Amino acid sequence: MTQKIKCALIGPGNIGTDLLAKLQRSPVLEPVWMVGIDPESDGLKRAREMGIKTTHEGVDGLIPHMKADGVQIVFDATSAYVHAENSRKVNAQGALMIDLTPAAIGPFCVPPVNLKEHVGKAEMNVNMVTCGGQATIPMVAAVSRVQPVAYGEIVATVSSRSAGPGTRKNIDEFTRTTAGAIEKVGGAQKGKAIIIINPADPPLIMRDTVHCLVEGEPDKEAITRSIHDMLAEVQKYVPGYKLVNGPVFDGNRVSVFLEVEGLGDYLPKYAGNLDIMTAAAARTAEMFAEEILAGKLTLQAA
């Protein structure tokens, strides 16, 4: 039996429940706690059925058990408003926080673009940007590594059913955090993000549009090659990530049209926005877990 790093999840909503399914397949991560605030929550009930310990008393219900249960990595899938306090409490117990809210108090992580940069930095909080950011920033980065991007704009369209109450409360944070990461991680000088929640029924698959204004005449061949290379990188952990059209060149504008189909772990396959977020978080946590298991990373209580 390979040793695994024990994890806890805060937030038993759409994202937390989908992430739980992914962690159970991980070779190096073992989910042991699910934390919520509603004793009747479907996510807590599902976690209990899987034999995972649960509390409906929020983070304060988890903290006393973290050391005894050996929890070293905690995922926060709640809301930007409560994340800072959650992170402070968890870090004080010497556990690493992976933030799936748009709070962004820690550095951004978009695995195919900058996961390797986080190795060896002993960070105690990393932020997974947003679902729209995880889907589109790799494409902005694919263009910006070929030539400078003066402006990057993304439009993420998600089905209404896949956007839970936490996502809806965080729309402003979504746009701000995603725009910031388009600049910091994607490499655009100026970023803008738009989210559209589509109420169509049956629900539509996640769709993303990426526009980049490059400086000078676009190097079509190099940009196209870079986009296809990046596509393959994302598909390693999100197989349903597809390039529907593009890159389309119009003057100095480069446009890419994407579709993200999920694995259907919790919500059906149209909810690719859950998948890309949870798969990226699991991938990031696995990298930290591998470092801990190899003795290269020792977590210190904050």
UniProtKB/Swiss-Prot annotation:
Q: Which SUPFAM superfamilies does this one have?
A: Glyceraldehyde-3-phosphate dehydrogenase-like, C-terminal domain, NAD(P)-binding Rossmann-fold domains
The Enzyme Commission number assigned here is 1.2.1.10
Q: Does the keyword Signal apply?
A: no
Q: Which residues form the active site?
A: C131
Provide the top EC class: oxidoreductase
Enumerate the Gene3D superfamilies for this protein.
Dihydrodipicolinate Reductase, domain 2, NAD(P)-binding Rossmann-like Domain
One BP term from GO: catabolic process
- Establish whether keyword Isomerase is in the entry: no
Record SMART domains? Semialdhyde_dh
Q: Which is one Pfam family of this protein? A: Semialdhyde_dh
| A GO MF term | acetaldehyde dehydrogenase (acetylating) activity
Residues involved in NAD(+) binding: S162, A163, G164, P165, G166, T167, R168, K169, N170, N273
UniProt keywords, alphabetically: Aromatic hydrocarbons catabolism, NAD, Oxidoreductase
Q: Which domain of life is it from?
A: Bacteria
Tell me what reaction this enzyme catalyses. acetaldehyde + NAD(+) + CoA = acetyl-CoA + NADH + H(+)
UniProt lists the family membership as follows: Belongs to the acetaldehyde dehydrogenase family.
State the NCBIfam families in the record.
Answer: ac_ald_DH_ac, PRK08300.1
What name goes with this protein? Acetaldehyde dehydrogenase
Q: Which organism is it from?
A: Acidovorax sp. (strain JS42)
